[in-house]
Amino acid sequence: MNATSSELLMLNFDVIFIELDPVKRAALLAEYYAEDCLWIHPGGRIVGREGINEAATEIRKHFPEYRYTVTSEIQTMHNVATCRWGSGMPGQPFHYTGTDFLEKRDGHVSRLYTFIDQQLFWS
């Protein structure tokens, strides 16, 4: 699949980061993320699909039923997409909100930057 940067950003919210099964998520990461991908978030830097899968597994342990909702228009420029989002229980107010910037290279996510508005479990 040669997805656009905005499509890859939506896959993060709708599929990858809500997947509870680490094996299924690993397959999704292999399909959509570059091998040397980088995720920078309030807790630090994670390099590679395996590290991102481990971090996503930890997030799902804390918030297994939470879903992500895009709350702004997705803006794109060149191979970068960005948007604001919120996360929480379906039908409830958001527990936390943030902004993501995603960079695409050769059809895959190469970099993901996550800014979170509230302090969570990362210190």
Regions found by a protein language model. Give the residues of each.
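Short beta-strand segments that buttress and anchor functional surface loops
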Residues: 83-90
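Short hydrophobic/aromatic-rich beta-strand segments that constitute the beta-sheet cores
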Residues: 39, 83, 111-112
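Short, surface-exposed coil-to-beta transition loops
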Residues: 67-69, 94-100
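Short glycine/serine/proline-enriched coil/turn segments at secondary-structure junctions
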Residues: 77, 90-94
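A solvent-exposed, acidic/Ser-Thr-rich amphipathic alpha-helical stretch
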Residues: 26-79
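Short acidic-aromatic low-complexity motifs
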Residues: 2-35
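Short beta-strand edge/turn micro-motifs at domain boundaries
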Residues: 97-123
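Short, positively charged
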Residues: 3-5, 76-83
